[in-house]
Amino acid sequence: MKYLFVTLMWNARAEMPGPGDIFAVCCQSYSPNGMTRYGRYTHLDDMSALTQWTKDAVYHNITVLETAKPRKEILNTIAETFPAYDVLVLWSRKEYELFRQAMHDCGHRLCTAKVVLLEELLGAVVRPRKRGRVPFK
């Protein structure tokens, strides 16, 4: 079986209507043949909407986002690098929806019906706190 682990980071403020701009993508594929990795920062559509969290995530080196390749180019590379996998693994449903929509916007379909959401899996095993969240990030 071939697994594709995807991690996204996105820039979003509470008042933003949508999920925000993806500014970092990291993918790792595990199969019996070995492991493949790909990770990149992406250029933000609106650099003026940068949040403090995003600045902290890039260690206040904003030039990495200003000079990064466009999101479409990064996602096209991901589609070429990881053309087939059996199981897609992400942290949360929000992250899955954001990745699915971003890939769809670039003309790519996710090639699996098997999706594992670690937050939901962990929530089923670990007793959540009062607000229904797992006690760590």
Predicted ranges, named:
Residues 60-63, 109-111, 125:
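Short coil/loop linkers at secondary-structure junctions
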Residues 19, 62, 112, 118-119:
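Generic secondary-structure boundary/loop-capping signal
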Residues 80, 87, 104-108, 124-127:
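Alpha-helix capping at helix-to-loop junctions
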Residues 94-115:
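Substrate-recognition/cap helix-loop segment adjacent to the acidic, metal-dependent catalytic center
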Residues 74, 135-137:
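Internal, well-ordered alpha-helical segments in soluble enzyme and binding-protein domains
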Residues 116-135:
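Short alpha-helix plus adjacent loop in nuclease-associated cores
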Residues 2-96, 102:
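Conserved non-catalytic scaffold segment of RNase H-like nuclease domains
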